Amino acid sequence: MCWKKIASWFKPDPVTPVAKRALLFGINDYKSIENDLDGCLNDVDDNEKKLTAMGFVCSVFKDSEVTCSTFYNEVKAALLSMRPDDFLYIGYSGHGTTIRSNHEPDGYCEALYLFDGPFTDDRMMELQQMTPAGAIVDAKFDSCFSGGMAKNPVKNRYYQMPGVPKVRKKVKRIAKSESQWVIFAGCSEEQTSADATFNGRANGAFTFYDLKCFGLGVSFADEITKIKTHLPGHGFDQAPELLGKTELFTYKY
């Protein structure tokens, strides 16, 4: 048998990056803290349904699947597979927090509080630097990085780290102007993101109304304008923010 001849025609299938991909992460049931949430898994399910209808290929991670290593590795793999003009949607619903840091003037940095602990803005910035030129990343964080109290009957999506005073932060360090990431923050710096109930079903307030605002042909700028109208109009004291390069805000889904 001529192995050389066989090798000449046997070639592995090329790995073709997905033009529109979504990574969706949600945590209701936390491993080591008592203040679990109610609407994060519904947020993920609802986003998956809508994004799939829009032509996205979705990967979903829930509760114990949303570890720091899984989040990092999944986002990294998706970024490294991207080509110019590819679109990656990253959705996170869960707690945010603040931790002590030597990198910030005030001594604290923001973090997503994942199933096994905080995922800091430093690690997120590592991922940003892997984004290929010309690719677009839309990252939505339905969480908060401030320690304010939410009014009943809603919960707030903030976890107060032991030994850390209440400080007010937002995702400013992971929204650098030179980045190809466009970031939707669920609330402004002095507010909290609500984990609420709509018609007997739990959702994040930001996600619930965001799903009504984005779709094919809608720009990021139009989306944030609509959300800012919906939330206060329905009694929620939170003003989502759009962060990143302003020239990317006109990009349409």
Model-derived features: positions:
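Cysteine endopeptidase catalytic domains of the caspase/legumain-like
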Residues: 2-253
